[in-house]
């Protein structure tokens, strides 16, 4: 932003507007004691006008650098426009979320052991064991597929309620 006076010299680093002096170095405001403030303003009107001119320049420079964000967004947005936009956004969001349901997240693999490197480094499972497990799974599948329920009597019994 700026400073009134600094003893540091400009090294050329950073933003030039940051190092720029708001008050010229040749002019400095006189130091006033608390009791002298009223006397100086009445005795020296030219000093007061110089101060006013410097202050007005500082205010003008500051006003140029300020961006009022609240005024920018609120230009012309009425309530029905906000409601229309909200409806439009919600329909778009509903379309996107329905598309996301198709892409179900694949569950991660279960963690069967805390040391998978030992399992991967061990000997592979023998082929005979794999055949035995496959045969048992086939028998279990055929047994489950042959289960039938035969209805021998009615499941709902009518009571003699008139």
UniProtKB/Swiss-Prot annotation:
Chain residue ranges for the region called Disordered: 1-54
Chief location category: membrane
Biased composition (Polar residues): 24-47
Transit peptide recorded as keyword: no
Record protein name field: Ragulator complex protein LAMTOR1
PANTHER family linked to this entry: RAGULATOR COMPLEX PROTEIN LAMTOR1
Gene name tied to this protein: lamtor1
Biased composition (Basic and acidic residues): 10-22
UniProt keyword terms in alphabetical order: Endosome, Lipoprotein, Lysosome, Membrane, Myristate, Palmitate
Source species of the chain: Xenopus tropicalis (Western clawed frog)
Pfam families (UniProt xref): LAMTOR
Coiled-coil blocks: none
């Amino acid at each position: 932003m700026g400073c009134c006076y600094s003893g540091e010299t400009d090294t050329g680093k950073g933003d030039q507007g940051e190092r720029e002096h708001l008050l010229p170095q040749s002019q400095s405001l006189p130091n006033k004691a608390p009791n002298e403030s009223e006397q100086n303003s009445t005795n020296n009107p030219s000093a007061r006008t110089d101060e006013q001119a410097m202050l007005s320049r500082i205010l003008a420079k500051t006003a140029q650098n300020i961006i009022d964000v609240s005024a920018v967004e609120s230009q012309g947005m009425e309530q029905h426009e906000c409601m229309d936009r909200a409806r439009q956004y919600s329909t778009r969001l509903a379309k996107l979320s329905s598309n996301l349901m198709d892409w179900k997240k694949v569950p991660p693999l279960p963690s069967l052991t805390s040391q998978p490197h030992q399992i991967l480094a061990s000997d592979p499972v023998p082929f005979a064991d794999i055949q035995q497990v496959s045969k048992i799974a086939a028998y279990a599948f055929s047994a489950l597929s042959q289960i039938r329920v035969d209805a021998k009597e009615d499941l709902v019994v009518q009571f003699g309620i008139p």
